[in-house]
Design a protein with these regions (language model features):
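C-terminal and inter-domain tail/linker signature
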Residues: 1-286
Length: 286
């Protein structure tokens, strides 16, 4: 059984979604396999894109014959088989979810109001040079956040600050360089959930494969909604945040990071009005 991101409950619903599209093309990006057994299983993961033209009605969404790009992460590990599909370009263009595009968020490479989702290929070739120590040091750095300063995490020690690509959900953007990542995602995310604790996540797995690596958390962390996020005021709720990460590393620096966040379910978990709105549009129950 595959565990899908919102709103797909099973293979049948997943396949019905794609039956509403034509000119479907899958583009593989990276495949990662653990180099050791994890709980008696070799774990594997991949990130890929599907581009397709929306030509038939899906739920209450009418076809527009536009072509959309979906970034998809997949993990098959000791916790099960999981697929996390970013729907936020498709939803944003149909006025179904918030996304960063106002003048306040303006940035030429990530949050341009005219932007569309693009495929990002690895900028680092695969090699056998193990990236585990650098990856794990970066994760430990994230856990050092003091609640005040991004510098407390020392991310500049782990990332190539100029060549870095953080390829997130369309709603957030493709962020280039450490400064853009901090300005347009990390600072906003930590204002949103300053008490986030990744060590308490469930179904967690992280592994490297040479200079490539992958992580999954389902959910990835425990946290409290304490700051405004995408216009949603804090209600002290416990957000559901399902995450997959895929990395490349060049020497001792991380470079590419495809980050899957189930943004629609995250929004649902922090705002009852949005949950009722999107569930109605998608005929979703449960």
């Amino acid at each position: 059984m595959i565990n899908y991101s919102y709103p797909f409950k099973n293979d049948k619903e997943w396949n019905k979604f794609w039956a509403c599209f034509d000119d479907i093309k899958e583009t593989g990006i990276i495949d990662v396999k653990s180099n050791a057994l994890i709980n008696n299983k070799f774990c594997k993961a991949r990130v890929y894109y599907i581009t397709a033209k929306f030509t038939r009605k899906w739920k209450k969404i009418k076809p527009d014959n536009d072509t959309y790009t979906f970034q998809i992460g997949e993990h098959d590990n000791t916790n099960g088989h999981f697929i996390n599909c970013d729907l936020t370009e498709f939803f944003a263009m149909n006025n179904l979810c918030p996304w960063q595009h106002s003048s306040y968020w303006a940035s030429s490479s990530s949050v341009d109001s005219e932007r569309r989702k693009e495929i990002h290929y690895p900028t680092v070739e695969k090699s056998d040079v193990d990236c585990w120590s650098n990856l794990w040091n970066m994760v430990k750095g994230l856990r050092m956040y003091d609640g005040k300063s991004l510098e407390s995490m020392n991310m500049k020690d782990h990332w190539d600050v100029k060549k870095m690509h953080w390829v997130g959900p369309f709603a957030i953007g493709h962020l280039k360089g450490l400064k853009e990542f901090e300005d347009y995602h990390q600072s906003k995310f930590l204002d949103f959930i300053p008490d986030r604790d990744g060590s308490t996540g469930q179904n967690k797995v992280i592994f490297s494969d040479g200079n490539y690596a992958a992580l999954m958390g389902h959910p990835s962390m425990t946290c409290t909604h304490k700051g405004e996020y995408f216009g949603f005021k804090p209600e002290k709720k416990q957000p559901r945040i399902y995450v997959m990460d895929f990395w490349t590393c060049d020497g001792d620096k991380l470079i590419d990071n495809w980050c899957q966040i189930d943004m629609i379910d995250l929004f649902r978990s922090i705002n009852k009005e949005y949950e009722e709105f999107i569930d109605d549009k998608l005929h979703y129950t449960g």
